[in-house]
Amino acid sequence: GSEMCIRDRFYNHKNTGRPLADGAWFQKFRSNYIDIDNEPLYPFGFGLSYTTFSYSDVALDKTSMTDKGELTATVTVTNTGKRDGAEVVQLYIRDLVGSVTRPVKELKGFEKIFLKAGESKKVSFKITPELLKFYNYNLDFVCEPGDFEVMIGRSSRDVKKAAFKLL
């Protein structure tokens, strides 16, 4: 059978289930603008710099937490260019299954750092149940148990991932 690839295309949207790949499905569900792509030109959080940065070693200090606990997500950012520069490290979280449809990505934190050429820095984000809350069908502000995906990167499109479970 044929295989279908579904990708996240915009920041903070809900998953439509529509494929982005070329072919018959793409022609059926593509935008009506024939002179531009479906992909946005710049992803949310995109920025320019006079230097380059790399992200590595995304890790969580725990693989699960309770609604009373917290966990820490860390990433190592390295200035791989020849100039000193600033970078905004962004934290996104995705609730994989919820009682109401959840966005494919939500910006939950960011930190601006300055690195000299060749310098590395470990950046940490504290993830609490408060960051996972949303309004359910009854308009209660709740966090529900389940699987979550943590994404850390330089924009909504360029991220490194880790996962945890809320018990």
Where are the model-predicted features located?
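Secreted, periplasmic, or luminal enzymes acting at the cell surface/secretory milieu
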Residues: 2-3, 7-86, 92-94, 149-153, ...
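Short, conserved secondary-structure segments in the cores of folded domains
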Residues: 61, 109-111, 139
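Surface-exposed loops/turns
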Residues: 67, 117, 144-145
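Intrinsic-disorder/low-complexity, polar/charged segments enriched in Ser/Thr/Lys/Arg/Asp/Glu/Gln
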Residues: 70-72, 120-124, 159-161
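Short, hydrophobic/aromatic beta-strand segments
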Residues: 84-91, 103, 135-136
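Intrinsically disordered, low-complexity Pro/Gly/Ser/Thr-rich segments with frequent PxxP/GP/PP motifs
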Residues: 99-135
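Terminal connector regions
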Residues: 128-167
